[in-house]
Amino acid sequence: MNEVFLMGKIITCIKFGFIINSKHFSKATFNFKLVDEQVIQINAYDKIADYIYSKLKQGDNVFIYGKLCKNVVNVIKIKIL
């Protein structure tokens, strides 16, 4: 896995759900538009997913530190800009 540092805007509603029979308890997913106009999918799990669902909304500008896994970025840390 590769580490990534991303800056951009949340462009979709944040989808939140619970996971059964997994090492993770909850998951948040949204699409993210980078400064250079590329769109990527972002996943977050557990406490980070709870934070994202409760504090962030569509249109927020954020900075993401995460890991690239296939075509998706898994969030390690996130900060509102």
Regions found by a protein language model. Give the residues of each.
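Single-stranded nucleic acid-binding surfaces, predominantly the OB-fold ssDNA-binding core
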Residues: 1-81
